[in-house]
UniProtKB/Swiss-Prot annotation:
GO terms for molecular function: RNA binding; tRNA pseudouridine(13) synthase activity. This is tRNA pseudouridine synthase D. Substrate binds at residues 27, 129, 329. GO terms for biological process: tRNA pseudouridine synthesis. Its EC number is 5.4.99.27. It comes from Klebsiella pneumoniae (strain 342). Responsible for synthesis of pseudouridine from uracil-13 in transfer RNAs. The active site is at 80 (nucleophile). Residues 155-303 form the TRUD domain. It comes from the Bacteria. Keywords: Isomerase, tRNA processing.
Length: 349
């Protein structure tokens, strides 16, 4: 299995070193749900600014304040403890008066707004995240500047970030141990983390190998192409290659790679053969995903940071601003800019 720090770079390995997350304020994440609260319903959406608190900890504290069970508080995505993050929590409080959440107090947290909502906020039910990232102690400003311009034009590989695999790769190691054992894993959190790490590693490996072997954004026969900004996709035929290539170049379509699991992977012919060959040696992880009935899916291989801008504070410090769709990782952008020093495995998704 290819380690995260050895995955192929789209723009070549960075020449510059740099410091990521010198302090929590250097990494700001603002969650974008893509919708506003309904203003009525049995749930309450709460927008919280937090620093030094992980999402589950805040959710449990909110449940305690409202005197409801912890499972009645949900969120769209996990946000890291070691960052400044703004996100929504959702509490189910039916048949009750509107709680006064201005009285909710937790060190490092501030309630920004709250309102009634008709539906539960479910995991993954967000549009994306707005990031502000400050990189410090940059050793080669011009190399970073050139790479930023290239990223604006060509994007970055849509790798799952190191945080998906746990500190020291613990989630992936757990998946590998589980794959080699017949013993069931009953802890729901461990199951979720380990299966996610397994599938993410297999995806990353496909992308890395394709990037190394071929022109990364070249459509091949049988590729599954995704409509930009949407989850639907179709398989390209030989007759459609030329037209599809033009649409990929214009960012109307995105080439995808497999998120392996049970069922049809989605690609066909040359593309399917290449995907299977890329992870052919990872038989135990593939078998685990099938055994646990994780359904196969697709994910775009390229990621284009939207609204990308940057501002050099001085020759060694740059502030980046960009928006990423849900499920994408800011670390996949940063790794194309600098060889990082800092907390890579504990960054918010």
């Amino acid at each position: 299995m290819i380690a995260f720090d050895q995955l192929t770079w789209l723009h070549g390995k960075p020449q510059s070193s740099g410091l990521l997350k010198a302090n929590p304020e250097d990494f700001l994440v603002v969650e974008d749900l893509g919708f506003a609260p309904d203003g009525e319903g049995e749930h309450v959406l709460v927008r919280i600014l937090k620093n030094g608190c992980n999402t589950r900890f805040v959710a449990d504290a909110l449940a305690k304040f409202l005197k409801i069970h912890a499972r009645e508080v949900s969120f769209a995505g996990q946000k890291d403890k070691h960052a400044v993050t703004e996100q929504w929590l959702c509490a189910r409080v039916p048949g009750k008066e509107m709680p006064d959440l201005s009285k909710f107090q937790l060190e490092g947290c501030q309630v920004l707004e709250y309102a009634r909502h008709k539906r539960k906020l479910r995991l993954g039910a967000l549009k994306g995240n707005q990031f502000t990232v400050i990189l410090r102690e940059i050793s080669h400003r011009q190399d970073v500047e050139t790479r930023l311009q290239a990223i604006a034009e060509r994007g970055v590989p849509n790798y799952f970030g190191a945080q998906r695999f746990g500190i020291g790769g613990s989630n992936l190691q757990g998946a590998l141990r589980w794959a080699e054992s017949d013993a069931p894993v009953r802890d729901r959190n461990k199951r979720s983390f380990w299966l996610s790490a397994a599938r993410s590693a297999l995806f990353n490996q496909q992308v890395s190998i394709r990037l190394k072997k071929t022109e990364f954004n070249q459509v091949v026969d049988g590729d599954a192409l995704q409509l930009a900004g949407r989850g639907s996709w179709f398989v390209v035929t030989p007759e459609e290659l030329e037209v599809s290539q033009a649409r990929v170049h214009n960012r109307e379509l995105m080439i995808t790679a497999a998120l392996p699991g049970s069922g049809d992977w989605g690609s066909q012919r040359d593309a399917l053969a290449a995907e299977q060959a890329a992870i052919a040696e990872e038989t135990s992880l593939q078998a685990l995903l099938v055994r646990e009935k994780v359904e196969a899916a697709r994910r775009a291989m390229l990621l284009y940071p939207q609204q990308l801008s940057w501002n050099w504070w001085d020759d060694v410090t740059v502030e980046l601003r960009f928006w990423l769709p849900a499920g994408s990782f800011a670390t996949s952008v940063v790794r194309e800019l600098i060889n990082t020093t800092g907390d890579y495995a504990n960054i918010a998704e």
